[in-house]
Amino acid sequence: TLLCVAMGLGSCNNTIPTDALQGEWQLVTMGTTAVTAEAQPTLQLNIKEMKVNGSDSCNTFIGGITNITDKDLVFSELATTLMLCPETTMQVADTFGAAMKKVAKYEVNDKQLLLKDDKGTVLLTFTKK
């Protein structure tokens, strides 16, 4: 325990819910706005390899997980393809991409994944696929 405090970890009892996070997630809301099936981003988390990939509804993306604890989740800069899509799909893709850049925290409950900013505001809500 002394080592944990010295390292600034506060508590060594924090465990990452790897099994709960691992897998494919489908976006249901961005902020308070529901997304439609025609433009529905997905997120694939590989916690063991610290990788993330998915679709923003127009383009595919890939990146890394740079920090993960029992509450914190930070992604690296995401690389995306550069497809041109219908305007409404592009709006979803742009909003999703901007939200992913702000993700700092998460919560998993009842087969839902909530991605939050550093203040705890829910940015993106996913359900397990």
State each model region's role:
Residues 1-2:
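Sec-dependent signal peptide recognition
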Residues 6-9:
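Bacterial Sec-type N-terminal signal peptides, specifically the leucine/valine-rich hydrophobic h-region
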Residues 12-129:
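Lipid interaction determinants
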